[in-house]
A protein has these predicted regions:
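Alpha-helical transmembrane segments and their immediate juxtamembrane cytosolic regions
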Residues: 1-177
């Protein structure tokens, strides 16, 4: 419940700024970027816990599929709505898009047991290694990984210009842990 209240307050402040009532730099100010990171982390960590509990209680694929379809459908609505509001920075892989993909991967990797701790650690660290490599020795590859068709993986040398960006990596690591 606390994450929902925090997200609501955050978005209220974002809306005030977007409408010009309270100018803030939500893209660069550490006060806002830190809160965004914490809120997304809480949501994904709780989603991972929820998946673990659901599997422990024997949740079948049919129920999972219905819940997943709701999340994926809402992600599509977010993309459509943001395209009208922010045509140059619409949301094509935000928190709901990421959660839809991550929930499928979490469901498929549920039998990994303790290996999920290692996989989660790798998922958390891999983007930093990719950023270093794509900014240095593998810079020629950056154009591909930074493109929209691959940047949803999170292996980028620079973040894309979009209103919300929650790539698969490192966030899958948060959901797995």
């Amino acid at each position: 419940g606390g994450a929902m209240l925090w997200m609501t307050a955050f978005h209220f402040c974002f809306d005030l700024s977007h409408l010009g009532y309270w100018p803030q730099d939500f893209r660069a100010d550490p006060v806002w970027t830190g809160q965004r990171t914490a809120i997304v982390s809480l949501f994904l960590f709780c989603a991972g816990l929820g998946q673990a509990v659901a599997l422990q209680q024997g949740q079948g694929w049919a129920r999972f599929g219905r819940r997943w379809a709701q999340i994926a459908g809402c992600a599509l609505l977010v993309s459509a709505g943001s395209w009208f509001m922010f045509p140059h920075s619409f949301i094509y892989f935000g928190v709901l898009h990421g959660m839809a993909v991550m929930l499928l991967l979490a469901r498929g990797s549920a039998g990994w047991g303790r290996w999920l701790w290692l996989a989660g650690g790798v998922a958390l660290l891999l983007p930093w290694g990719a950023q270093w490599a794509l900014s240095g020795p593998l810079a020629d590859w950056a154009v591909y990984f930074n493109a929209r068709w691959l940047n949803w993986l999170g292996l980028v040398s620079r973040k894309p210009y979009t209103e919300d960006y929650v790539p698969l990596l490192p966030w899958l690591g948060v959901l797995w842990w």
